[in-house]
A protein has these predicted regions:
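Nucleotide 5′-phosphate-binding alpha/beta core
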Residues: 1-107, 159, 373-422, 426-444
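Conserved AMP-binding loop of ANL adenylate-forming enzymes
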Residues: 95-130
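Short alpha-helical
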Residues: 16, 117-118, 147-148
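Short acidic, glycine/Ser/Thr-rich loop/turn "cap" segments at secondary-structure junctions
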Residues: 75-82, 105-113, 135-138, 186-187
Length: 444
């Protein structure tokens, strides 16, 4: 993407951005080089999109297309406009994923929330664009309704050669764990968005769904309501991530953190990424065009060749020669305990170990009350599982073992006598901590 050309077009045609530039004393004609572009002030929800009427944020000040609502996971919901042309650009990312799965008769099952929320209808629209391109795909959209999924899959999945589940990671796992369906016979593939997950999670879900090759049967999408899908996992990025997951020191050297980020590849022809202070900015020509938009995602950029030079092995997977972007779970999904930042991703790995993973769902709530004798972790039990002291002790042991392995701050900052977490086991779908049908909050 040519950022200067995009900037000049947005400055000339988007009323809100023209006003933003005037407010910051920027003369659009003075922005001629990428160095000039890098001096432009960041745009954010607070200083830009929430300060202007929705139509003024659109091209030519005209609101058109479909309106989506962000999940509100970091605050109040926001509204975003997207046209069919915008969807067609994003559909290229879906095409790359589906090409990786193989072009054969496919049932696509949209398990994201439907309605005004961005995930379900946007995914449905992109899959329909693939149908228009000749992909042999049939799509059904039961949304995040397990009963409806159980009703349609037995009838439709046997008619296809593979079934692709599109959904939020914890929901997809819940569906596979709780619905008594012959998953292996459906030749399942899984596409997720909305949450960082561990490689232990990928392996566990693959085993339960009868997936033989987790590298070529999964894809996580990195996206936002603001701009749609920004990047996607490829078999190459998954192989690299799985290699680094088993080598925390090497991962720390490359990513500079005690947690494993989502690792995807992106197309610089349609998304312009920048890194600033360990966070990501992007620019793109969407239904609401955005310039140097700061979405508070922690992460960074690594060019394709640099990544292959740094990982220390020769990947078996051939991948597109596209740059990598890595994205951590947001810092608000962490707690500070004795000065150590403990991330939700660190806790997840412990719950995905074979000693406990059939007794729990993988969902939890992490807290570090002032003066506590240990981290407080409230864990959701699997359906039909009763709580017990023995299980709580085993969960605590798995969590602390992998916290020490993955998080050097925790190991060195937290006194050993306070490293064992305090576990509370709650029933499946407990309305207080684990209400069904809503996006789960891991830190409260």
């Amino acid at each position: 993407m040519a950022p200067i050309e995009l900037f000049q077009r947005v400055a000339a045609t988007v009323p809100a951005y023209a006003a933003f530039l005037r407010e910051h004393g920027v003369d659009a004609a003075s922005i001629r080089t990428e160095a000039d572009f890098a001096t432009l002030p960041f745009t954010t929800k607070d200083n830009y999109t929430r300060r202007h009427p929705l139509n003024d944020l659109c091209r030519d000040g005209v609101l058109r297309g479909m309106i989506a609502v962000s999940s509100g996971s970091t605050g109040e919901p926001s509204f975003w406009a997207r046209t069919a042309d915008d969807e067609k650009v994003i559909a290229d990312r879906f095409a790359q994923v589906m090409d990786g799965f193989g072009r054969r008769p496919t049932l696509a099952v949209v398990c994201f929330s439907l309605g005004t929320w961005v995930g379900g209808l946007f995914t449905l629209a992109c899959v329909r664009h693939l149908q228009d391109r000749g992909y042999p795909i049939t799509v059904v959209a039961p949304g995040n309704n397990p009963a409806e999924i159980a009703r349609v899959l037995p009838q439709l999945a046997p008619l296809a050669e593979q079934t692709v589940l599109f959904g939020y990671p914890p929901f997809v796992k819940d569906v596979i764990d709780t619905l008594d369906l012959p998953w292996a016979s459906y030749h399942i593939k899984i596409v997720t968005a909305g949450e960082v997950f561990s490689e232990e999670w990928r392996t566990l879900v693959a085993e339960r769904a009868g997936i033989a090759d987790p590298v070529r049967s999964f894809a996580s999408l990195y996206g936002t309501a603001d701009a749609g899908v920004l990047g996607n996992e490829t078999p190459l990025s998954i192989e690299i991530r799985r290699h680094l997951a088993a080598r925390p020191d090497k991962a720390r050297e490359i990513f500079g953190a005690d947690r494993l980020p989502t690792l995807v590849q992106y197309d610089p022809a349609v998304r312009y990424f920048e890194e600033s202070g360990g966070t990501l900015l992007f620019s793109g020509d969407n239904g609401i065009p955005l310039i140097r938009y700061h979405i508070a995602d922690e992460g960074g950029l690594i060019p394709y060749r640099e990544m292959l030079d740094r990982i220390g092995f020769e990947p078996a997977q051939q991948g597109p020669e596209l740059p990598f972007v890595y994205v951590f779970g947001r810092s608000r999904f962490a707690v500070s305990f004795y000065g150590a930042n403990v991330y939700a991703e660190n806790i997840s790995v412990g719950l995905e170990q074979p000693e406990v993973n059939r007794a729990v769902t993988g969902k939890f709530v992490l807290a570090a009350p002032e003066g506590a004798d240990g981290l407080h972790v409230t864990v959701e039990l699997a359906p039909g599982q009763d709580p017990s002291d023995d299980l709580a002790e085993e969960v605590a042991a798995r969590i602390v073992t992998h916290l020490r392995r993955l998080n050097s701050e925790f190991t060195h900052y937290v006194p050993e006598r306070k490293q064992l977490p305090l576990i509370t086991l709650r029933p499946y779908a407990d309305p207080g901590d684990f209400p069904p049908g809503v996006k789960h909050r891991y830190v409260r």
